């Protein structure tokens, strides 16, 4: 029985890890193709939400998903996407967790994306 619990926990954590990794990558790609910072942030959140729900992981953003310096959305600039998810361990009742589950594991993913030199508002970064 303990071995079964270990396997169940490993599968749950792996599913969440795959979900946050995919969410970070998809959010970065959605932001990069948006055309502006405001619509990019919305698209990034939607893409991350979709990727997480595909893996059956509940998620809601805690602040901005896309981390960038001045978010100028100029070609050649790079930005980071960080996604965190707290998953509940298997067989732990929801009522025991409350709003912040102590019987859980936090899984994180980071993805860095660079805007194409000809993307964005027409301004090109000196690095292009």
Spans of model-derived segments:
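Short, conserved structural patches
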Residues: 33-128
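Alpha-helical assembly-interface signal, strongest on the long, hydrophobic N-terminal helix that forms
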Residues: 1-49
């Amino acid at each position: 029985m303990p071995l079964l619990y270990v396997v169940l926990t490993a599968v749950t954590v792996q599913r969440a890890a795959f979900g946050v990794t995919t969410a970070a990558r998809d959010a970065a790609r959605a932001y990069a193709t948006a055309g502006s910072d405001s619509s990019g942030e919305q698209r990034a959140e939607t893409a991350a939400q979709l990727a997480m729900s595909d893996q059956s992981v509940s998620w809601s953003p805690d602040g901005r998903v896309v981390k960038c310096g001045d978010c100028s959305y100029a070609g050649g600039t790079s930005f980071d996407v960080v996604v965190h998810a707290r998953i509940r361990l298997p067989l732990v009742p929801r009522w025991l967790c409350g709003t912040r589950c102590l019987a859980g594991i936090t899984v994180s993913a980071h993805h860095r994306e660079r805007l194409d030199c000809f993307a964005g508002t027409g301004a090109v970064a000196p690095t292009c």
